[in-house]
């Protein structure tokens, strides 16, 4: 069993973009930024326990950090992990109303 403290460290924030809003409407899929060292099972249990919804599947993607230029220096943004969480039909993940 994963501790409550670990659940809160797994999920970092929702990823808001045009693609994520389309996937939410069409496929009932939520996109979240998660910690880089988490597994799919940890993500699934964290979402189910924190938001009280049933998760159908979890898919993860590593996003490579971009190379940015700042005056005459090159700066690299850090890599991060994104999780596509498919919620079962009839359930919805609303971030503002489910937080206790």
Curated annotation (Swiss-Prot):
The keyword tRNA processing does not apply. One of its GO terms (molecular function) is structural constituent of ribosome. GO terms for cellular component: ribonucleoprotein complex; ribosome. The keyword Cell inner membrane does not apply. Keywords: Ribonucleoprotein, Ribosomal protein, RNA-binding, rRNA-binding. GO terms for biological process: translation. Belongs to the universal ribosomal protein uL23 family. NCBIfam families: PRK05738.1-1, PRK05738.1-3, PRK05738.2-4. One of the early assembly proteins it binds 23S rRNA. One of the proteins that surrounds the polypeptide exit tunnel on the outside of the ribosome. Forms the main docking site for trigger factor binding to the ribosome. Part of the 50S ribosomal subunit. Contacts protein L29, and trigger factor when it is bound to the ribosome. This is Large ribosomal subunit protein uL23. It comes from Buchnera aphidicola subsp. Schizaphis graminum (strain Sg).
């Amino acid at each position: 069993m994963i501790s409550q403290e670990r659940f809160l460290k797994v999920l970092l924030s929702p990823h808001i973009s045009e693609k994520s809003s389309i996937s939410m409407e069409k496929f009932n899929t939520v996109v979240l930024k998660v910690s880089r060292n988490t597994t799919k099972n940890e993500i699934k249990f964290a979402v189910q326990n924190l938001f009280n919804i049933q998760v159908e599947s979890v898919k993860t993607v590593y996003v490579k950090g971009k190379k940015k230029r700042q005056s005459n220096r090159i700066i690299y943004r850090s890599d991060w992990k994104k999780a596509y969480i498919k919620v079962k039909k009839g359930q919805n993940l609303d971030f503002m109303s489910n937080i206790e």
